[in-house]
Curated annotation (Swiss-Prot):
Residues 384-393 have a biased composition (Low complexity). This is STAGA complex 65 subunit gamma. The keyword Transcription applies. The modification Phosphoserine is found at S106, S321, S332. InterPro entries: BTP (IPR006565), Histone-fold (IPR009072), SUPT7L (IPR039460). Keywords: Isopeptide bond, Nucleus, Phosphoprotein, Transcription, Transcription regulation, Ubl conjugation. It is found in: Nucleus. Sumoylated. Residues 81-107, 364-412 are annotated as: Disordered. Pfam families: Bromo_TP (PF07524). Its main location: nucleus. GO terms for molecular function: protein heterodimerization activity; transcription coactivator activity. GO terms for cellular component: nucleoplasm; SAGA complex.
Amino acid sequence: MLRYWGEIPIPSGQTNRSSFDLLPREFRLVEVHDPPLHQPSANKPKPPTMLDIPSEPCSLTIHTIQLIQHNRRLRSLIATAQTQSQQQTEGVKAEESEPLPSCPGSPPLPDDLQPLDCKNPNAPFQIRHSDPESDFYRGKGEPVTELSWHSCRQLLYQAVATILAHTGFECANESVLETLTDVAHEYCLKFTKLLRFAVDREALLGQTPFPDVMEQVFHEVGIGSVLSLQKFWQHRIKDYHTYMLQISKQLSEEYERIVNPEKATEDTKPVKIKEEPVSDITFPVSEELEADLASGDQSLPIGVLGAQSERFPSNLEVEASPQAPSAEVNASPLWNLAHVKMEPQESEEGNVSAHGVLGSDVFEEPMSGMSEAGLPQSPDDSDSSYGSHSTDSLMGSSPVFNQRCRKRMRKI
């Protein structure tokens, strides 16, 4: 059998197989796995829980955390008290329910609410520049304490736990604390690297575009000015502590009102209002106004009809009516209808100046009489409108109705 150089010998027991025989008989889906979480602290030994150096936490922050826990407990007590009162209203006996506990006391206020380096409350977190001639500025004096990696990790872990408790979280898993500690560790590394580059650049060039290298690094990482730390201390730490004190006081008072409602009613005294004598103010009434009230306008207020001089201006001449005048009756706008035929009553045929009564011919009259060419003429072939038999009514005396009638007469 001819063999080539480098040819792999085929065992005698193995038969020739095609490429299709090498394919798998059943196709299986490949399982997708998430990429593993990058946690820098996973490959390093876990530091012990006890700190190598004593920590000095801020008393203001610790007291704020205690107030948050106290407020959480007060809210649970208030919810329990409200549930019991609701059950009593529904018919559950008071003996079956457990007695409400007394209001727990607020955590004591620490004596030193400010850190050791921040005793002045008027200027908290004040920035002080070191004296260039001092030993600290020259790097002389006591040696600086160097922290090991385990000590830094422990302090950072405790700081992250304090921040979460100050924010309002009651509990957290250890894996969450480890992950957030790694995030804070990476942020600190980035900050210190930028600070190292800025210091070297300032030493090389002899100047920096910012007032200080620390100010430059603060802008590069996105914090802003160095004064933003002072604003954060004032608003997020001090003002938040004052707000928690107010909330604790309000919740304590609310729980006391629920537990002791009788005491709450005794404490609330009624507000006394000093009574002063009130004198009646009299307004003089003119003689002309009394004369108008004596006329037929007494049925409506003065503000509706107006005075006699306001209803009939001096420059408007009222046409004389051949019939008996009755201005007091027909002057009311409530009885004046523009296109309604007015007929006298049967008992007052002689005096047609009284109020007209609607007759049946008003509704039986065809609409062809109301053409657009003009209005129908009055029965006595006068030029006045067909609205009323009395020309001294409001329709004849009012300038509004007079102008409209004369305008239509010009069209005719």
